[in-house]
């Protein structure tokens, strides 16, 4: 039997009810919560991220919520570092880390580790930005396609941050992101074969979602409508009023925020903004489902069931995560 300390992953698509179940679990288990969400890290972005209320967070604290200003970037590597530190602190107090959220790349980074990418090089980054100003980002995307077609296929020409980083990695290291990630994948496979652990925990993997996809779509539509009624547009106006924030930042590119930003720019009508915001959220949920379908040892719960807490506890007891 493994002597590794326990941890619980509670995953699922957006609007599935992850937070509610996580709160119920913390009421009956010695758990402490860690958020796994690339948008919830930002302060001042509350309505559009469906961030738990201040009252709820005061009663049930979540690590890694409201830790950054929207002007700052936060990578999967940053998350892995912060999450491992939080998990170690929680475990040291005899508690169980309960990680809850839907940013699947973060879970993957935590489980498998990350490719050893070169550190940012301000000089190279400045050179890339100068080229972009002179030639346009499409020309730089063409450069990336020539050296790393796999990354170019994933990165849109209008995503300057990721495009710049992919070119920077190649210019600094002489290897493409795809090559470095392939090397990391091989190392992870070899580590698993030799019994080495990327993550020093015995992890129970839970996922919650409605079995009826149409129900999820209706939830997404209703939640986006509720956000607008709660003042989502005013929240984005406050962000736009800051001179250091712009549409190219990761925070502003978050689902919902980019559509409201475009509306305020006059690029979309109110109806178009609502429609595109809902569609973008559905597309996010679809991507989350794609990740989850490939996840190993995953125990599914139906959002519509009224007995998910006992079902989750039964599963955790079955795999001896609580012993």
Swiss-Prot record:
Matching InterPro entries: Dimethylallyltransferase, IPT, P-loop_NTPase
Uppermost EC category: transferase
MF terms (GO), sorted A to Z: ATP binding; tRNA dimethylallyltransferase activity
EC number: 2.5.1.75
Any Pfam family: IPPT
Annotated residues for binding of substrate: 14-19
Cofactor dependence: Mg(2+)
Keyword Transmembrane: no
Transmembrane segments: none
Reaction(s) this enzyme catalyzes, per UniProt: adenosine(37) in tRNA + dimethylallyl diphosphate = N(6)-dimethylallyladenosine(37) in tRNA + diphosphate
The UniProt record lists the keyword Zinc: no
Disulfide linkage: none
Tree of life domain: Bacteria
Keywords: ATP-binding, Magnesium, Nucleotide-binding, Transferase, tRNA processing
SUPFAM superfamilies recorded: P-loop containing nucleoside triphosphate hydrolases
Residues that hold ATP according to the record: 12-19
Annotated coiled-coil segments of the chain: none
Renumbered residue ranges of the record's region Interaction with substrate tRNA: 37-40, 161-165
GO biological process entries: tRNA modification
Site (Interaction with substrate tRNA): 103, 125
Function per UniProt: Catalyzes the transfer of a dimethylallyl group onto the adenine at position 37 in tRNAs that read codons beginning with uridine, leading to the formation of N6-(dimethylallyl)adenosine (i(6)A).
Family the entry assigns: Belongs to the IPP transferase family.
NCBIfam families assigned: miaA
Record note on quaternary structure: Monomer.
Protein name from the UniProt record: tRNA dimethylallyltransferase
Organism in which the protein naturally occurs: Pseudomonas fluorescens (strain Pf0-1)
UniProt lineage: Bacteria, Pseudomonadati, Pseudomonadota, Gammaproteobacteria, Pseudomonadales
């Amino acid at each position: 039997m493994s002597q590794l300390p326990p941890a619980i992953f509670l995953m699922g698509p957006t609007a599935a009810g992850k937070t509610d179940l996580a709160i119920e679990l913390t009421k009956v288990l010695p758990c402490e919560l860690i958020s796994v969400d690339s948008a919830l890290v930002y302060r001042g972005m509350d309505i559009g991220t469906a961030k738990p209320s201040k009252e709820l967070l005061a009663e049930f604290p979540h690590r890694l919520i409201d830790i950054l200003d929207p002007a700052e970037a936060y990578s999967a590597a940053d998350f892995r570092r912060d999450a491992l530190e939080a998990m170690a602190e929680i475990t040291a107090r005899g508690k169980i880390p309960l990680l809850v959220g839907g940013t699947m790349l973060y879970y993957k980074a935590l489980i498998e580790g990350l490719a050893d990418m070169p550190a940012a090089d301000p000089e190279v980054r400045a050179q890339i930005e100068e080229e972009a100003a002179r030639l346009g980002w499409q020309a730089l995307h063409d450069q990336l396609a020539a050296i790393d077609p796999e990354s170019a296929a994933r990165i849109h020409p209008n995503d300057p941050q990721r495009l710049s980083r992919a070119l920077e990695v190649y210019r600094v290291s002489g290897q493409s992101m795809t090559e470095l990630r392939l090397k990391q994948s091989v190392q992870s496979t070899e580590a698993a074969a030799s019994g080495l652990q990327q993550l020093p925990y015995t992890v129970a993997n839970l996922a919650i979602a409605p079995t009826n996809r149409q129900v999820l779509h209706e939830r997404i539509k209703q939640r986006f409508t509720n956000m607008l009624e709660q003042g989502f547009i005013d929240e984005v106006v406050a962000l736009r009023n800051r001179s250091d924030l712009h549409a190219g930042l990761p925070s502003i590119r978050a689902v919902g925020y980019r559509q409201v930003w475009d509306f305020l720019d006059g690029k979309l009508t109110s109806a178009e903004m609502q429609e595109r915001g809902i569609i973008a959220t559905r597309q996010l949920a679809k991507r989350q489902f794609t990740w989850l379908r490939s996840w190993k040892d995953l125990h599914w719960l139906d959002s519509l069931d009224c007995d998910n807490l006992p079902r989750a506890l039964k599963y955790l007891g079955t795999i001896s995560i609580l012993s």
